[in-house]
Amino acid sequence: MNENLRTEDTYFFGHPKGLVTLFLTEMWERMSFYGMRGLLVLFMTREITDGGMNLSAPEAMAIYGIYGASVYFLCVPGGWVADKIFGAQRTVLYGAIVITLGHYVLAIPSDKTFFLGLVLVSIGTGLLKPNISTIVGELYKPGDLRIDSGYTIFYMSINIGSMLGFLVCGYLGEKVGWHWGFGAAGVGMTFGVLQYIFTKNSLGNAGKRPNLSDKEDINKYLSTFKYASAILILFLVTGFLGIWSVDAEFL
């Protein structure tokens, strides 16, 4: 290994210290994501007496499909927001906070908060997911051969987080109560947010600034972002509610 590398650049298994921050953030985000996702269809199709929503399988799968599609669809504007407005570091933080709020809203036992929670998690994931991987790449200088192994280590966090989510949220959701499982996802994401806030200085300038220097351009993009956000939120809400047809007993 190059002896000229700074100590902080080899902190984590020979990799930059900031990789620890991103590893743990991704781990907790994936824990909350897969933990909650594993409960969705089961919760929606269970009888009301079992704490569920008593939806039919087609209705539940339709909602699940819209949620899954919206998560990946929102990654496109999420990347744009980081690139043009906030920078990747702040966008990841804002996304993590919105995800956390979404999980806690899901933990409230109400049909209305269920759909609101899904919308929040979708938006937050769209902000976080495309940008955290970008920051990983920016931790390394051009030509640094460690970048491939750095991504390998980073992607291990996805496997660890998903396993934790299925074990913790799955157990609490089925054995204790559905909303306990959703709440556990929120607690996990809270850990992720806190550790990101307290250790994000280790990221240095990686993903810190958007690719804009002109203040007028920034204001223009902020204005566009506000209108686009309103349209996206309206689309998600009407999409979820449009397929939610339940009988009078449930209402």
Please place each PLM-identified region on the residue numbering.
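Intracellular loop-helix junctions on the cytosolic face of multi-pass helical membrane proteins
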Residues: M1-H15, P142, G170-L251
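Central cavity-lining transmembrane alpha-helices of secondary-active solute carriers
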Residues: M61-A82, K129, M163
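Hydrophobic core of transmembrane alpha-helices in multi-pass small-molecule transporters
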Residues: M27, G102, T113-L128
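Short amphipathic helix-loop junctions that connect adjacent transmembrane helices
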Residues: G38-E59, S245-L251
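C-terminal ends and interior cores of transmembrane alpha-helices
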Residues: Y94-F115
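Cytoplasmic membrane-interface "Motif A"-like loop-to-helix N-cap segments
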Residues: K84-A96, G143-D144
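A gly/Pro-rich, aromatic-decorated transmembrane alpha-helix motif that marks the paired
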Residues: R37-G38, P77, I160-V176
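Intracellular juxtamembrane helix-capping segments at the cytosolic ends
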Residues: L127-P142
